[in-house]
UniProtKB/Swiss-Prot annotation:
Classification of source organism: Eukaryota, Metazoa, Ecdysozoa, Nematoda, Chromadorea
Cross-referenced InterPro entries: EGF-like_Ca-bd_dom (IPR001881), EGF-like_dom (IPR000742), Notch_Cell-Fate_Det (IPR051022)
Membrane topology, Cytoplasmic segments: 640-661
Native species: Caenorhabditis elegans
Subcellular location: Cytoplasm; Membrane
PANTHER family recorded: CRUMBS FAMILY MEMBER (PTHR24049), DROSOPHILA CRUMBS HOMOLOG (PTHR24049:SF22)
Principal location: cytoplasm
Miscellaneous comment in the UniProt entry for this protein: Removing the EGF-like repeats in any combination completely abolishes fertilization. Modifying each EGF repeat by changing a central cysteine residue to a tyrosine disrupts the secondary structure as the specific disulfide bridges responsible for this overall structure are not formed. The cysteine to tyrosine mutation when located in EGF-like domains 1,3,4 and 5, causes a complete loss of function. The same mutation in additional EGF-like domains leads to a temperature sensitive sterile phenotype.
Start and end residues of each EGF-like domain: 52-90, 210-259, 377-414, 519-557, 559-600
Name of the protein: Sperm transmembrane protein 9
Length: 661
């Protein structure tokens, strides 16, 4: 009513603009009351509320042993000196084996008892950079591999933002190598700190994001696939451009994919590969000797092919006899070298999946052994299954499989899952996240044991409770549980009678305690929830719960629609609204004439009218103002007109007297 009086006063004051402003103010959405809004994600809200909180200022000594404190989004981390490590630099590192350590980026070296093998990634990176400068694509030599593999008895504890066995990889390095090139090339940080991609064939762009039309097109016999753009139709098609001539022997290459090769009958037989009575050494020797010396680049490239022999023992050797090793198939083909000239040589098609190399000369012991490419890349055989601590590679019918160690799963044993081996036996296993702090040497899981089992303090597994006091059939149609419980149990299972006999029977539905042998109504002491109705199932000697609308589950324990389940019956004089923030899951919006939590309190007519006016204030307030105005103005107008009539009547009387003196 105070608002109405204010509007009336303003109306008579002639300030209609102020009335409009008040109505606009009332129409605005009420601001959210953050303090009263229930928090269902306290962790995310805490980060939002406390992201400017600086724990380093609140506790300047939070990092011990001269560690430097840095904060980020309300959290902190410590940059420790090389002599300490840990969340707050609380651990002292044993420096016994760290005199010549290779730990990078201010990481902490910690001595360990056993030797471990690591890859000197710093040296490997230097070798690759040098080879890129020299334009060499040859595999790593045995000397280089021996230099890269290191056996050390220390570990590197990395500072925040660094990774790898030597803490030499930054977050930028990892992102560049694994993500930036979209899986279509190799990324590397250049001298200016920018990530550059070396794209695979048929991919191009700064991030190898564009795909050539030649991606699915294979050109044989030295053919080169080219993208042909039709600007009218705005389409790109792949076309194979075949060699126009074949050096030394002549011949032509034709076909849509350059698949047709015609060799003239006049071609010298010593220049024909895969011929009987000849071999690789004789062929390349005569072939290269007949190439003009003005094509020295071609000669060098063909010499490299001839010497591309590496069986793991004899590196950069040559084929001494035959064309291919290990039952490889000799396949003649035209090869285009860097100068774009085409030569008719051959390649070996390996028939054994365990062999590779240009001559199929590299043969692995089994599928778990390293391929030639993996050796050149610096991979290790014990990394086939992530590392030796996660699992081991086993050859099964010529296919490599990872046999994971306890607590690890996945195709390469890369997933840490302490519950995978079911360590709790008779209970449920709950894994402890890697982010949680646990004492060194303790399990990274927790066992939740059922009533029929208890936790073994030594193995931390759930073991069956001693059932010697539970004779066979003692509990009929139920489960026998011994009354051996700890003295500090807050809710002991057994009563005095149970303790005297040494056990308690937990009966199935439809059987009465204490020994679960007397059959009764299965709905006796049923577990149906949320007003569900218990129905007997005579076939199963059990019961089913018939759920009310809005609930579900075997015991009707889940509520999907609180209004359908309960609210519509309670909000008789109102409308039920599902409200997850309300403890009972719904709230009542009352009809006119009722109020209260359940809209069960009837209110006076005057209060109803006031509520209606306030609900429709945009229309009702101006109307009320008008009615009040009319109620006040009408008497004034009537009095004014009566007064005016009296004046006019008096005036007429005066005029009559003047005319008749």
């Amino acid at each position: 009513m105070n608002v109405i009086l204010v509007l009336v006063v303003l109306f008579f004051a002639g300030d209609c603009a102020k009335i409009r402003k008040i109505i606009d103010f009332l129409e605005k959405d009420a601001p959210n009351d953050i303090e009263k809004t229930p928090n269902y994600n306290e962790e995310s809200l805490a980060v939002k509320r406390n992201k400017n909180f600086n724990p380093c200022l609140e506790n300047p000594k939070i990092c011990s042993n001269r560690g430097k404190c840095l904060h980020e989004n309300g959290n902190f981390y410590c940059i420790c000196p090389v002599t300490h490590y840990g969340k707050t630099c609380e651990h002292v590192s044993d420096q016994t084996n760290c005199e010549k350590h290779l730990c990078q980026n201010n990481s902490t070296c910690v001595s360990i008892k056993s030797l471990r093998t690591i890859v000197n990634t710093v040296l490997l990176r230097q070798i690759r950079v040098q080879r890129k400068v020299n334009g060499s694509k040859a595999a790593l030599t045995n000397e280089e591999l021996a230099e890269i593999d290191l056996e050390v008895n220390y570990e590197c504890i990395c500072q925040k933002g660094y990774f790898g066995g030597l803490c030499d990889e930054s977050e930028a390095d990892r992102t560049c190598q694994e993500v930036y090139c979209l899986g279509r090339g190799k990324g590397a940080i250049n001298a200016t700190g920018k990530c550059e991609c070396e794209c695979e064939n048929q991919f191009f762009g700064d991030r190898c994001e564009q795909i050539s039309a030649c991606f699915d097109t294979q050109c044989d016999n030295g053919g080169i696939c080219e993208d042909v753009v039709d600007w009218k139709t705005k389409t790109v098609t792949a076309t194979c451009k075949c060699p126009s001539a074949i050096e030394l022997i002549g011949g032509t290459v034709t076909g849509e994919n350059c698949e047709t090769l015609q060799i003239p009958s006049t071609a010298p037989k010593e220049f024909i590969p895969c011929a009987e009575g000849s071999n690789s050494t004789m062929f390349f020797k005569k072939f290269i000797a007949n190439i003009s010396l003005e094509y020295m680049d071609d000669i060098s490239e063909l010499e490299a092919i001839k010497n591309d022999y590496n069986d793991g023992k004899n590196v950069n050797g040559t084929m001494t006899d035959g064309w291919c090793r290990n039952d490889g198939k000799c396949v003649p083909e035209v090869v285009r070298v860097n100068s774009s000239r085409a030569y008719y040589i051959y390649r070996c098609e390996c028939t054994n999946p365990l062999t590779d190399g240009y001559y199929c000369e590299y043969k692995r012991h089994d599928s778990c052994s390293l391929t030639r490419e993996e050796v050149a890349r610096g991979d290790r055989w014990d990394e086939k299954c992530t590392d030796s601590q996660h699992g081991a590679c086993v050859d099964i019918s010529g296919v490599a499989h990872c046999v994971c160690k306890p607590d690890y799963t996945g195709e390469k044993c890369e997933i840490f899952d302490p519950c995978a081996r079911q360590p709790c036996k008779h209970g449920d296993c709950i894994p402890i996240p890697n982010t949680a702090d646990v004492a060194f040497g303790t399990s990274r899981y927790q066992c939740l044991c059922p009533l029929s089992a208890k936790l073994n303090p030594e193995s931390q597994a759930c073991m069956e409770i001693n059932e010697k006091k539970c004779a066979p059939g003692a509990c009929g149609n139920g489960r026998c549980v011994p009354c051996e419980s700890d003295a500090d149990d807050l809710m002991p299972l057994c009563n005095d009678n149970d303790n005297r006999q040494g056990f308690r029977c937990l009966c199935e539905a439809g059987y009465l305690p204490p020994f679960c042998k007397v059959h009764t109504n299965p709905c006796y002491q049923n577990l149906c929830q949320n007003s569900a109705t218990c129905h007997i199932d005579p076939k199963q000697r059990s019961y089913d719960c018939q759920c009310v609308n809005g609930t579900r589950g075997s015991l009707c324990e889940n509520v999907d629609d609180s209004c359908d389940a309960f609210g519509n019956k309670i909000c008789v004089h109102g409308t039920c609204i599902n409200d997850e923030y309300f403890h009972r899951g719904f709230s009542c919006e009352c009809d006119d004439g009722f109020e209260g939590l359940d809209c069960n309190v009837e209110i006076a007519w005057s209060s109803v009218m006031t509520n209606r006016l306030m609900k429709n204030y945009e229309f009702s307030l101006p109307l009320v103002a008008c009615f009040v105005s009319l109620a006040i103005l009408l008497p004034v107008i009537v009095i004014s007109r009566r007064r005016q009539g009296r004046v006019e009547e008096a005036k007429k009387t005066s005029e009559v007297k003047t005319e008749n003196p």
